[in-house]
Each structure stands twice: as structure tokens, then as C-alpha cells.
């Protein structure tokens, strides 16, 4: 999530609006009224030309009681109480226990915890070494999948931290990170991930052994 010039909290991956809307401006430079009617879907497929940029509040209304959310905070340096606004919205929609708030900026996690200590947080990092496990404002760590190590998972979990892994889009990679004992996975293919994890949880040793033999023969 990011914040517009007039303080609206919106759901947008890029800091610049050009790739998805055609407007070559940073999110923090525009007001909500300037962008709320922009076509935010045609870049992906023409059938999505009616898709608009959602606010965080709109997303929470749709998702409440249905799914858990991982909300990444992307501060621009021009924000006005972005973290506090996120915390207030989670409280308003009674979603503090069904969301995790993550960020590359550790200071954003500090602000979230100071606003509402009950909200779960995750520190996004592209490395899995060093003394990360004692960061008090991070309840977990979100690590790039190819850099994850079993020793880091063990160390973090021993310290009471959750492990999130991103972005896992192949069965081979998913099997590897699940085997390390991770707690959560971020993927563009949730159906694949759900089916594979279900299969692993309900299959026997011999099921997995036969599957490996069949793969060797391919």
C-alpha cells in the first residue's frame, strides 16, 4: 500500500503509475481524485479495462471474513502517518488478527507496532544471514526463496519468528522451501501451492518415493 498526496491509502505495487495506468507520475504526487477513475487493467488484458485502482479500505471490505491478507507498506518518504492509517483501518474492520503487515522498511514495522502492538508484522529481506532474529518490531521474516537456508529457518523459528518465502511459482522450488519448515509462502499460483502442500501433508513415504522414481525416469 502507498499514500496519495491527499493522504488516501491505495493498493498499488509500483511507485510510479505509468506501467499500469499510463500516467507518468509518482503515487505521492497525485491526489485520489486525479487517479480514482484511471484504467488500471488494460495493461494486463483489454477485458480488464474497467478495473480501477482500489483503496485499502475497499479491499478490506471485500476480504473481511474470507481470506487473510499480507499488506506490504511501501513508504515514499512523503507520507503522512501511513502506518497509523493502516493500523486504524485494520482495527475499524476487525482484521488485526487476519492480516500481517510487511515492509522492506523496518521503521514502518516500528510505527505499526507503536500504533497497535497486536498487529503481526514481517520484515522483507533478500538475504537470510546476519543477526536478524532479534529485531523486536518484526514478528517474522519474508525472504526471497532462492536465498533461504534451513539454518536461518531454524534460528528464526527458535526465536519465535514466522518465516514467509517469496516468490515461489514452481513445484520444485515449493517442495524445497516447504521441506525447510517454512510457515508461509507467497506465490502467483495459489492453486498449485495449495494442491502440492495438501498432497505432501496427506501422502505417505512410499507415495513420495514412487513419485521420485517416476520423475527420475522422465
Show where each model-derived region lies:
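C-terminal active-site rim and adjoining tail of enzyme catalytic domains
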Residues: 46-50, 122-218
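A glycine-centered beta-loop-beta connector
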Residues: 4-9, 177
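Conserved metal-phosphate-binding beta-hairpin within the catalytic cores
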Residues: 1-3, 71
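Ser/Thr-centric signal marking residues that sit
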Residues: 4, 20-21, 55, 167, ...
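Short alpha-helical
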Residues: 4-5, 77-81, 107, 148, ...
Amino acid at each position: 500500500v502507498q499514500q496519495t498526496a491527499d493522504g488516501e491509502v491505495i493498493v498499488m505495487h509500483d511507485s510510479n503509475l505509468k506501467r499500469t495506468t499510463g500516467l507518468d507520475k509518482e503515487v505521492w504526487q497525485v491526489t485520489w481524485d486525479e487517479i480514482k477513475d484511471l484504467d488500471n487493467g488494460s495493461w494486463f488484458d483489454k477485458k480488464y479495462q474497467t478495473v480501477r485502482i482500489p483503496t485499502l479500505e475497499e479491499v478490506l471490505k471485500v476480504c473481511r471474513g474470507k481470506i487473510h491478507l499480507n499488506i506490504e507498506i511501501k513508504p515514499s518518504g512523503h507520507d503522512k502517518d501511513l502506518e497509523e492509517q493502516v493500523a486504524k483501518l485494520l482495527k475499524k474492520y476487525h482484521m488485526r488478527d487476519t492480516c500481517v503487515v510487511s515492509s522492506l522498511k523496518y521503521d514502518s514495522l516500528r510505527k505499526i507496532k507503536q500504533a497497535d502492538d497486536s498487529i503481526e508484522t514481517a520484515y522483507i529481506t533478500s538475504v537470510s544471514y546476519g543477526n536478524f532474529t532479534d529485531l523486536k518490531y518484526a514478528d517474522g521474516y519474508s525472504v526471497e526463496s532462492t536465498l533461504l537456508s534451513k539454518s536461518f529457518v531454524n534460528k528464526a523459528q527458535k526465536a519465535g519468528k514466522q518465516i514467509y518465502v517469496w516468490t515461489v511459482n514452481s513445484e520444485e522450488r515449493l517442495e524445497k522451501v516447504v521441506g525447510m519448515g517454512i510457515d508461509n509462502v507467497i506465490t502467483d499460483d495459489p492453486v498449485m501451492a495449495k494442491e502440492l502442500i495438501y498432497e505432501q501433508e496427506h501422502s505417505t513415504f512410499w507415495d513420495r518415493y514412487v513419485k521420485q522414481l517416476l520423475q527420475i525416469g522422465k
